Amino acid sequence: AVISRSWLLAQVEKNFNLNGSVTPYKSCYRNNETLIRWYDREDHDLFDVCADDHCQRYQGITRASNPIVREVIKETRGEVLMDNDTICDARFSKCCGGVTEKFENCWEPVPHSSLTALRDDEVPSYPDLTDEREAEQWIRTSPEAFCNTTDKEILSQVLNNYDQETTDFYRWKVEYTQEELSRLIHRKTGMDFGPIIDLIPLERGSAGRITKLKIVGVRRSFTIGKELEIRRTLSETHLYSSAFVVDKKDIRLDIPSRFILTGAGWGHGVG
């Protein structure tokens, strides 16, 4: 209750401040070679939050209310998380993949001291996942983490009923044929890359999530970011996360016949 209340009030406060600002809020930077975009709440100007992913799938209390929930709300009435004089933006993800991501790697480049990189384990140390070699080693293995669990009792406490149907979220794989991937990217971007030659991570965040991805095709190349733009481009809906590595298979004349994406975590990983 305290976390959800803090997140909600932080969004209301942010909207109020943005509406009073003389500088327009920008969530997209584009030129002929690059599109960097993040998704927050710009999809709706007339209300503060919604039930979509960019609003933490906020559903209020009508969809998840019972005597225990009502009692918790009553017992914590008026309580919020604070960062000095500011209400904490207490956003969260389903599974960080072992290390939490920094806010500025997923949204506007404004650091939040309460939304930074932390190891999701009793042991606080972790490798430099902005380094491609370290990130690949991390993603291809299954390090100990609190979110590395298949315990149904634990998952039932933190996931909605429909989310509990997904079990391979700590480490996962997605495979595309050349035809599937090239058609998907063409449809999602509106650009004709021709056959896809490569997907190249140009920049990773603190949790190993790709923040800039270069798509290389026979006809053109283009760089996209941030994490949700990448996830939406490479999936009919969106990938579990942008913390992934790419294996190219059955390469003929420099063109792979298959792409295998091996990934870590579920969601943006922040919080």
Task: Please provide the spans of the model-predicted regions.
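Conserved, single-site charged/polar hotspot
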Residues: 1-271
